[in-house]
Amino acid sequence: MNNNIRTNKTKEEFVKEMEQRINIRKTIMDFVDNVYFPMMATKFDGKVYNARFINALNAEAKKVSDRMYVKRGYSNDEIEIQLRLSQWNYNDYESILLKCKTNAEGRIDYNATINDHYTKVWIENFKSYIEEYQKSIDNYDEYMKVFAELGDALMKYNKLPHSFRGHLDKAWMRIY
């Protein structure tokens, strides 16, 4: 069988689960890059990665972990979120990133519109990944209810409503 003693899973099961987690992480980062950061930038005169914006993100990051920091990338249109965590600590990586994102959402201009194409693509991709992952989730009905609320709210209003706060964070924690 060659089971992993810590997870009690075969090598194939373990690899498949890691691939699913990576896909979900890519989907979240796509949302952060294409929807969330441009949305937050409306508070900073449209300059997405200026010093004031990065300082604001860092202030939010410090609220959830002193191991997290945000810095400018190699060019003015890049940003890096970095964590001083062990390489395989998926739970901490994702939960801290989403806590930081959720906390920072209070700064967003909720009347600004977001790119509808990215919103729909993100929701559909995320739902498809979650469907693949559902077999290992105990409380699946409650889990999908949260994502249904999130998807309906985003597509109906084409902006981030106040009810969006905390949805991702609470739902994501149920994956683990």
Show where each model-derived region lies.
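Negatively charged, low-complexity tracts enriched in Asp/Glu with abundant Ser/Thr
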Residues: 24-68
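Ampiphathic alpha-helical segments that act as solvent-exposed interaction surfaces
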Residues: 24-27, 111-165
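Amphipathic, interaction-prone secondary-structure segments
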Residues: 50-100
